[in-house]
From Swiss-Prot:
Upper lineage: Bacteria, Pseudomonadati, Pseudomonadota, Gammaproteobacteria, Pasteurellales
InterPro entries the record matches: MTA_SAH_Nsdase, Nucleoside_phosphorylase_d, Nucleoside_phosphorylase_sf
Active site as annotated: 12 (proton acceptor), 197 (proton donor)
Origin species: Pasteurella multocida (strain Pm70)
Chain's gene name: mtnN
Protein name stated in the entry: 5'-methylthioadenosine/S-adenosylhomocysteine nucleosidase
Pathway linked to the protein: Amino-acid biosynthesis; L-methionine biosynthesis via salvage pathway; S-methyl-5-thio-alpha-D-ribose 1-phosphate from S-methyl-5'-thioadenosine (hydrolase route): step 1/2
């Protein structure tokens, strides 16, 4: 088995890259791919860059070049559900674009043509992540994660996302693009992210301050998943 892992930013993949043995590094376009062994498991680790297009380019390269059997998306997210705090873990049941709208042609909000209304995460991976979070005594929630090419800082954008997707737990900028690529390639995926901010008016300051904590928390979760796959 080969495990694929995707993070957008250097801080979100560095801990795992540092643990990798027999490491081979490939730079393609704006993406960096690390291949090697982590705790005796074959891993392909991608730093994709930020945003949906970068994530889709990177995920496609990862799946074509490295042929992983599954993909875990790691990193940080803005927590918008009640009860989520900085450092808590969110696990995707499903993902959707909050900035896609083809409803004029009868599609659901967030749905693109030829795609499902929402991209479903692999249930076995979801359950494994949830089990590990509980074992690590992490605060964890599973549910809907919404993606778009905007850093959400409260106000009208956040209100609109909540109106369109009342069950949304967290917002970020890559997960659904990765999910769409995995769906196209029929590769199981799950999103495991740690909360860095609350998507409100203080989000940018909170993100800068708490990104290292979120990256550490999500990477620790993924490392434990590697050990249990």
């Amino acid at each position: 088995m080969k495990i694929g892992i995707v993070g957008a930013m250097a801080q979100e993949v560095q801990m795992l890259a540092d643990l990798m043995q027999d490491k081979r590094v490939t730079q393609v376009a704006s993406c960096t791919i690390y291949e090697g062994m982590i705790h005796g498991k074959a891993v392909a680790l991608l730093q994709s860059g930020i945003g949906k297009v970068a994530a889709a380019i990177g995920a496609t390269l990862l799946l074509e070049m490295c042929k992983p059997d599954l993909v875990i998306n790691t990193g940080s997210a803005g927590g918008v559900a009640t009860g989520l705090n900085v450092g808590d873990i969110v696990i995707s049941d499903e993902t959707v674009y909050h900035d896609a709208d083809v409803t004029a042609f009868g599609y659901a909000k967030g749905q693109l043509p030829a795609c499902p209304a929402r991209f479903q995460s692999d249930e076995k991976l979801v359950q494994l992540a949830e089990k590990i979070a509980v074992q690590q005594q992490q605060q964890v929630k599973r549910g809907l994660i919404c993606s778009g090419d905007s850093f959400i800082q409260g106000g009208t954008p956040l209100a609109q996302i909540k109106a369109d997707f009342p069950t949304v737990m967290a917002v970020e900028m890559e997960a659904t693009a990765i999910a769409q690529v995995c769906h196209a390639f029929n590769v199981p995926f799950v999103v495991v992210r740690a909360i860095s901010d609350s998507g409100d008016g203080e989000a940018s300051m909170s993100f800068e301050e708490f990104l290292p904590l979120a990256a550490k928390q999500s990477s620790a979760m993924v490392l434990e998943m590697i050990d249990n796959l």
